[in-house]
A protein has these predicted regions:
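Vicinal oxygen chelate
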Residues: 3-11, 36-39, 50-120, ...
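Residue-level signal for secondary-structure boundary sites
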Residues: 46, 66-68, 113
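N-terminal beta-strand motif that seeds the catalytic metal site of vicinal oxygen chelate
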Residues: 1-17, 44, 56-60, 109-120
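General secondary-structure edge motif
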Residues: 18, 51-52, 79-80
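N-terminal first-folded block
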Residues: 5, 9, 13-37
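Conserved short beta-strand elements that form part of the metal-binding/catalytic scaffold
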Residues: 25-56, 102-109
Length: 120
């Protein structure tokens, strides 16, 4: 598994984007309503705006979400959500980390897998 993103909740999205632009010269590679994605080499930083700054998510890219999920749960990780296909084209599972950290295992689904899933 390789780390591929951090997902952070911020109170002031515009302020956070201005800070990353000023300090790191980082511009969003994606901007949606109340959220933005910045790229730092192979790592994505996902910023979501919310009133409470609560949870940080660390995402790991995996070739086999189900197998890696079983491995880390077998090592004592606590599951939040078991592996499932997500609408954004990945198979993902969520685990409870220390403090307010959530860990996400994310496996890219190819277009053929998504097409066959939606056909059934």
């Amino acid at each position: 598994m390789d780390g591929n993103h951090f997902h952070v909740i911020v109170h002031d999205l515009a302020g956070a984007l201005a800070w990353f632009a000023r300090v790191w010269a980082a511009e969003p590679v994606y901007r949606g309503e109340g959220m933005a994605v910045l790229r730092f080499g192979p790592i994505l930083l996902i910023l979501d705006q919310d009133e409470e700054e609560t949870v940080t998510t660390i995402g790991y890219a995996t070739a086999d979400c189900d197998a890696d999920f079983r491995t880390v749960v077998g090592r004592g990780a606590h599951a939040i959500e078991e592996p499932a296909d997500r609408s954004w084209g990945v198979r993902a599972a969520y685990l409870k980390g220390p403090g307010r950290i959530t860990l996400e295992l994310e496996q890219a689904l190819d277009a053929n897998a998504r097409s066959s899933d939606s056909a059934t």
